[in-house]
A protein has these predicted regions:
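Acceptor/aglycone-binding surface of glycosyltransferases and processive sugar-polymer synthases
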Residues: 1-5, 10-13, 22-98, 125-147
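Cofactor-binding loops of NAD(P)H-dependent oxidoreductases
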Residues: 14-16, 118
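Acidic metal-phosphate-binding loop of nucleotide-sugar-dependent transferases
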Residues: 18-20
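Surface-exposed beta-strand edges and their flanking turn/coil or helix-capping segments
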Residues: 57-58, 106, 115, 130-133, ...
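Catalytic donor-sugar/metal-binding loop of nucleotide-sugar-dependent glycosyltransferases
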Residues: 72, 93-96, 106-123
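Cell-envelope/extracellular polymer assembly enzymes that use nucleotide-activated donors
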Residues: 103
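Terminal low-complexity segments of carbohydrate-biosynthetic enzymes
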Residues: 145-160
Length: 160
C-alpha cells in the first residue's frame, strides 16, 4: 500500500471520494506541525457541514465504540488522518477495508497517543455512491459489518 512505501517523516491519507480534499491533509499538517513533532500524536479530521442523518449516525457509532473500548473516540471515519511514520509499526495486523480508520484510532488510544481533531468541511460527493451506502439499506449493512468488526477487534484487544 501507499502507506508502507511512503518515505516522508509523516504519513497522511484521505478517501478518494474527494469529500475532503488532498489539500486538507496538507492543511492539517500545517495547522498541527508542532504537535506532530511529538511522535505520540494522531491528527484526524472532524467533519463539518454534514446532513443531520449522517451526523446522528456518526454520533451513535462514536458513542458505541467509546463504550465498547472504554476510550473516547469521535467521528471515526473522518478524513484526513495524519501521523508520524513511526506509528506504522503498530499497524501490522490492520484490516484491508474501511475499518482501517477505526483500527488506527483504537491502536493509537491503546498506545496512549493523543488524538487531535482538525476541522474539515465535508463537500458533496461528486461521483458514485458511498461504500457505506447513501441510503438506509446501505447504512444498515455498514452498521452490521462494523458492529461485527468492533466485537472482533475488542476480543482481539483483550488477548494483548
Amino acid at each position: 500500500s501507499g502507506v508502507k512505501i511512503a518515505s516522508g517523516e509523516y504519513i497522511g491519507w484521505c478517501h478518494a471520494d474527494l469529500q475532503t480534499e488532498p489539500m486538507d491533509v496538507y492543511n492539517a499538517y500545517l495547522a498541527n506541525s508542532e504537535q506532530l513533532k511529538n511522535e505520540k500524536v494522531i491528527i484526524k479530521g472532524l467533519r463539518t457541514n454534514r446532513n443531520m442523518f449522517d451526523g446522528i449516525f456518526t454520533l451513535g457509532m462514536s458513542v458505541f465504540v467509546s463504550i465498547v473500548f472504554q476510550r473516547i473516540i469521535n467521528d471515526i471515519n473522518a478524513q484526513p488522518k495524519l501521523f508520524s511514520k513511526n506509528f506504522i509499526k503498530f499497524l501490522n495486523h490492520h484490516p484491508h477495508d474501511f475499518s482501517l480508520d477505526l483500527y488506527l484510532l483504537i491502536i493509537a488510544k491503546l498506545k496512549n497517543y493523543k488524538i487531535i481533531n482538525h476541522r474539515v468541511i465535508l463537500k458533496k460527493r461528486l461521483y458514485g455512491e458511498a461504500k457505506g451506502g447513501g441510503n438506509i439499506k446501505g447504512k444498515l449493512k455498514l452498521i452490521i459489518r462494523t458492529f461485527i468488526y468492533i466485537f472482533q477487534l475488542r476480543k482481539k484487544m483483550w488477548k494483548l
